[in-house]
Amino acid sequence: MSENFRSKAITQGVQRSPNRAMLRAVGFQDADFTKAIVGVANGYSTITPCNMGINQLAQRAEAGINTAGAKPQIFGTITISDGISMGTEGMKYSLVSREVIADSIETVCNGQSLDGVIAIGGCDKNMPGAMIAIARINIPAIFVYGGTIKPGHYNGKDLTVVSSFEAVGEYSAGKIDENELLAVERNACPGAGSCGGMYTANTMSSAFEALGMSLPYSSTMAAEDDEKADSTEESAKVLVEAIRHQLLPRQIITRKSIENAISVIMAVGGSTNAVLHFLAIARAAGVELNLDDFETIRGRVPVLCDLKPSGRYVATDLHKAGGIPQVMKMLLVHGLLHGDCMTITGKTIAEVLADIPEEPSPNQDVIRPWNNPMYAQGHLAILKGNLATEGAVAKITGVKNPVITGPAKVFESEEDCLDAILAGKIKAGDVIVIRYEGPKGGPGMREMLAPTSAIIGAGLGDSVGLITDGRFSGGTYGMVVGHVAPEAAVGGAIALVQEGDSITIDAHARSLQLNISDEELTRRRANWQPRPPRYTTGILAKYAKLVASSSVGAVTDLDLFNK
């Protein structure tokens, strides 16, 4: 039976002789023109350790597709290194790259009439970018994570890249000398793979496994281990079977499977960025999802894993302890997972997890027993109030002071804030406000890992609050609130805060409040004027024009023809 469900448009009939001529030049033989043509979206790049091992994985995917009787075609997609661009103008392009990746995969798959696609990515925006495209085009697809980095080691401690960011704050506070700073820098990132804690890349890969769009155990494998390459080849074979059975992404990415993914994000203590990305993925899949849904799930799912940034362990430790299947089985047994959701394997979640123990091994403490979780409820809270009428996102577990009321220290950019922290101008009890860093205002909604790490390094993590219309790295922890919406650039209340204003962040009440009267807020709003755009040409200008609020995922295709 012919398996070229879509590619027959470019391979069949007399009129397609020129098309076949070009395909012959890239290795097609007569027998290949009735096979499924499978794209391999290759995120290989030496820009970042996250992606530098992906080329070998793409080759294994190619081998798996050939073995399964289909025809592979490799194409490239881009990446930005969040870690390297952090704290610079370059970080404005990070969230933008999510859209570029999505658009590029959609463009190639539809432009070349591919029958399916295996997307291989590493750095943070590779995952949501690929899944947005997969949900849009709705052809058989599977996602392969490039793999996590192994921890670095120094002075008896495991290190991640966040250790280096925090060392900057420690050095500026006089807690370590330059030799110690350099030692951490030299040992933090020992090889290939994405940042090792439960930061954004590992959060999204774990969520995609829970979603059913990646193979079991694949999300926590180390990039440099043989099992990662073996899993990639197996993923390719599974995809070819999905093409034969026409198992489509929108049969897998449903409201219930997205709830499963969010539940796992809560259970592993994942990144705030997952909120933004799943809002966008849901939209691409035609699934209704809003911020309140995250809060509902947060209230019923415990944090089961002791993982960095706020915990002790990294993703490779989670893998040894049973990986995401162990976490999922615990949630399933306690009625917090939809077991009837389909996966890319052709089996349901319940079938995939059938042989997994109901409780984790007692010989490890990465995954806690159900009756002794890290926290009884999830950590990603949605805060609302007069400073964030559409909502804001915060990590609320593990903070020693769940309520902070203090004077506002207002900064118009991340750089100005970082300079003030390193100069010792921020004191215990202050509430830092970094604004005009939102999707439109940045533009690009930069991550604030540099200032938050500097706060931690300076010993102020438990006594200083930080709010922003920008984002936070998955490596961030402390009393920090991001994704404040509406953002400053569109006249949100964060634009109206004045130096010294009293602000309250209340994690218990999940509120974010500027402590001034409604009359004063109205007066300030009447006097507010929008700022001229920072960019008038190029991709940042286009992005600022098109991007929607963070409260709906900062997508760029919302109500396009009403703008």
UniProtKB/Swiss-Prot annotation:
| Annotated InterPro entries | DHAD_IlvD/Edd, Dihydro-acid_dehy_C, DihydroxyA_deHydtase, DiOHA_6PGluconate_deHydtase_CS, ILV_EDD_C, ILV_EDD_N, IlvD/EDD_N
Query: Its catalytic activity?
Result: (2R)-2,3-dihydroxy-3-methylbutanoate = 3-methyl-2-oxobutanoate + H2O; (2R,3R)-2,3-dihydroxy-3-methylpentanoate = (S)-3-methyl-2-oxopentanoate + H2O
The cross-references to SUPFAM superfamilies, in alphabetical order and at most eight, read: IlvD/EDD N-terminal domain-like, LeuD/IlvD-like
Q: Which GO terms describe its biological process?
A: isoleucine biosynthetic process; L-valine biosynthetic process
Q: Where, by residue number, does Mg(2+) bind?
A: D82, D124, K125, E447
Cofactor info, note text: Binds 1 [2Fe-2S] cluster per subunit. This cluster acts as a Lewis acid cofactor.
- MF term (GO), any: 2 iron, 2 sulfur cluster binding
Modified-residue entries (N6-carboxylysine), positions: K125
Keyword Amino-acid biosynthesis (UniProt): yes
Transmembrane annotation, as ranges? none
**Involved pathway(s):** Amino-acid biosynthesis; L-isoleucine biosynthesis; L-isoleucine from 2-oxobutanoate: step 3/4; Amino-acid biosynthesis; L-valine biosynthesis; L-valine from pyruvate: step 3/4
State a single Pfam family of this protein. ILVD_EDD_N
Q: What is its EC number?
A: 4.2.1.9
Kindly list the positions annotated as binding [2Fe-2S] cluster. C50, C123, C195
The annotated active site, in chain numbering, is: S473
Query: The organism sits in which domain of life?
Result: Bacteria
The record's subunit annotation is: Homodimer.
The record's similarity note reads: Belongs to the IlvD/Edd family.
Q: What is this protein called?
A: Dihydroxy-acid dehydratase
Source organism of this protein record = Nostoc sp. (strain PCC 7120 / SAG 25.82 / UTEX 2576)
